Every structure is written in C-alpha cells, then in structure tokens.
C-alpha cells in the first residue's frame, strides 16, 4: 500500500465543486437519491488518491500515449555546433535536445583516489556536490538548469564468465563501479532564458551565446572549487556512454539490441544506485536554482528486469525517463565522479578498498604471485583488456587474456603496464600496502576469495613477473 498516496490539487477540487451539485440534483427526484452523493464521493476519491504518483485519469492518459509512441524510434538530437566565447580556445558544443538547447561539461576524475566502502556507503573525495552546482547556477545563470549524468558499470562482461562471477562474489553489493564517467549537461529552455539571451543577441543566436558563456563560467567555477571540469567540444563520448541500443519502448522497460534497460525512481542516492546489479548504469540528477533536485536511474540487464527493493519502475514513461523528461523529487547529494576501480584489499576494520586504474597511464609493480593473480583477474572482470607474455599462456587462456610482447591492461582511456614503463606514474601493490603518486603508503589487508587459488596454480613455475 506504500504506492497509494493522497494528493490535493486545486484544479481537481474546482472540477469536483462544479460537477457535484448537478450530480446530486440529477438523482434527487428518482428513487436512487443515494447515487448522486455516491458519485461525488467516488469523484473525490479519484481526485485525491494517487497510485505511484498518478491519478486514475493520469494512468489512462499515460496508457494511450504509450500506445501511440511505443513503436516509434527515438528522436535524435540535432547535430552539434561549436560556439566560442570571447576568449579564444574556450569552445563549447551545443545542440538541441527536443525543445531545449544543451551544452556539455565533462568532469575529470581525480587520479589515484581510493574508495572505501563503510557499511554500504562509498567514501571518496572525488565528488561533485549538487549544492555547489545549484549555488553556481543561482549566481551566474538562474534561468538555466543542469543535469549531472554518470554512466558506467560495476563489472564488465568481456572477461571469462567464471572470472566475472568470482569478482561479483568478492564485491557483493558494494556501490563500487569498476568504470564510471560523469558529465554535466547544461540546459537552456528558450522560454525561461529569453530575457538573458536577448541581452546578447536576438533569437537563437543570443540563446547560443548565453548558453556557451554560462557553461564556460560554470566549468571555470567548478575548477576553482577543486572539481576538474572541462567544456565539451563534442557529445561523442557522452553519447557512447549513454547509448542503450534503443529498439522499442514497452510499458515498464525498454527493449534494446541484446538487453533490457529499465528506468527507475530510487531516492536512496548514489550508494543505492550503484549497488544494484546491472550490466550498465546511468544516473541523472537535475539541479535548478530554488527547487529540490530530481533524479532517475537507468539499469541495463541481459534479461527482463525483476522487482528491485528500493527501486520503482517508471510505468508508461520509460522513453520520457530516458530522455530526461520524467524525474522524481530527491535531495542534494555528493555524487562520485570517476570510477571506484578495482578491489585491492581492505582496511584494518575490514572495509573494502578500491583503486581506479582506468583514468591515467600507470606502471603497476605487483608484489608476488598472489597479488599478480588477483590484479589480473579483477582487472579483467572490471573491463580491462589483459595482455600477458607468451610464457603465461595457460594462465592467459584460463583468464581470457591475450598474448603479446608487453604485459599490460588496456582500459578505454588509459593503460596499466604490468612492469616498468618509462614516462608514466608508478603504482605499487603489495599484500599489505598500496603506494601511489598521491599516497606514499596505504596499509591494507588482503582479500582472497577461495576461488582465486586455482588461477594462481596456473602460473608458470619459473618467474613471477608478468612480462
């Protein structure tokens, strides 16, 4: 019964007040005198009671709207146009998304930032505070709004199935995505921003100049507050990260090419959103001056979605949620920016520790055979493409790694070399500590699930290095 709510609306109250007297008078001189008050009572209940946020008429309207559009393809955004501010080199791509003009800011992850999971909550200093974003909008462009969009995955399906299953068991329900990127989409509604845009130029040209200048200023202010933000010259990376392979909208899910993507409302925040098992996760938090933030979550799974605790599907509005037209009221959050990374150990209090490797090139010095085995297994499950030397062929076949002249893990935007490599930062992993350019020595305890032992036995007897 938690889905049932009472919701008062002035418009509905006026309609009931207007129609109630005729209903009562209609049956007054019949033997069904009770029918008039009964109809009024039913109308009052229908006007007050909502189910999952909609009244009965709202559900009927949503159903017929879904019938009309369910087989239509998605409307593609317009081709991006790059506009420049008065400062040469500050280029910002803008495009139309429906009736709204949008620009993109990419938030750059802070390298070598560990994430510690304490009682199901992720602790990291690589975050963007939605309160700060609302403050910047209020000061510099109060008639604009911004969406903080994160996309990524907890584990990847590119490695051997046994390796992925083993890593999923090791991380459990930790809100620790192996890969995640974050953008801010600045949105300009021509109706709301008409006055500010008109000061710069007439029509669309003024709106473009206003959006470009505002986006540049927000990125600069975020950087001054310790959040590395870069204006996007294109939407290519964002589009690739948020593509779900849309084919057809169903009532409570979206059919993709080889998967199902479901839009949910889940007010629990990023710790809840990123703990849900899924092949791909997209989160969106909308921030606007003077109003509470709004959010929605999209989870992609290979099979039809099942009921999730704490998540409510957006019934009859999956396409609208995908296109950022349906969001639910939320609260301010500190949103993680980059990847949590790979599980490297735990603290003395047995809290898991994760370290990202997918944001900057590194040379990884692995302490012994067990650490080497664990890192290769977990990096493969996290989405890295592992390459090992020829004498590691039995181990590579077991893991699903490639054979090549140089041992490394290739991530989408970085490479981790398993050994010395000139010109890149060095990370040292031992069973009892982690050393990075940012942290000299972080003491840790090893996490060794039972299933990892059989992989270590496949290592060659001579030599314990990766090359």
Regions found by a protein language model. Name each.
Residues 131, 135-144, 379-382, 465-466:
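A short, charged
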Residues 3, 112-116, 362:
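Short small-residue beta-strand/loop micro-motif enriched in glycine and branched aliphatics
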Residues 1-79, 427-467:
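N-terminal alpha-helical membrane-insertion module
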Residues 46-141, 339, 343:
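N-terminal topogenic membrane-targeting module
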Residues 168-467:
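Membrane-proximal, solvent-exposed terminal domains/tails of membrane-associated proteins
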Residues 111, 152-154, 188-192:
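Short loop/turn segments at secondary-structure transitions that flank enzyme active sites
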Residues 141-183:
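Structural flexibility/helix-modulation signal
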